[in-house]
Amino acid sequence: SSDVCSSDLGDIVQGNIRIKTQGEKFSALLYVTSINGFHPSEGQKRYNFENMTPIFPNERLIMERPGGTTAMRIVDLISPIGKGQRGMIVSPPKAGKTTLLKDVAKSILRNNKEMHLIILLIDERPEEVTDIKEAIQGSNVEVIYSTFDELPEHHKRVSEMVVERARRLVEHKQDVVILLDS
């Protein structure tokens, strides 16, 4: 008998594949070993994002860290960030938004090890993507990007996939931060 497991947009499915034959374009997935890092049976226990209750931020994310920048201390004092909060950095070009974003990412990794961090880079230069991928690394970090040479439809599709990915992780009771640079 074969077990059937379902996956949704945003799930990362791992498993064993069958070697493709000459007429096939893709290899077939023979056996699913994990969905989002969990055993496939865990997927049936996960919550449905649409049925979850939104709440106001009630747990703070500390940005100051040893060896970090003064900017993160200022964020903690002037504009503290809480889990579940949305925020925006607005500034003219070349004012340091990407540098601030990297500082925030490093602080989240250092001070909130349970957080899953997704960094979404839209309409960026490939060099900036490489810089962030090298600067921000970890087992709970995903850097997703759509460079400036991609079509706007691709930017939109990548953005929607990141939101769905975050939803799937939240359904598994994981805390997720999306940092968007566009």
Question: Positions of the model-derived regions?
Answer:
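Phosphate-binding/switch loop-helix module in NTP-utilizing enzymes
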Residues: 155-182
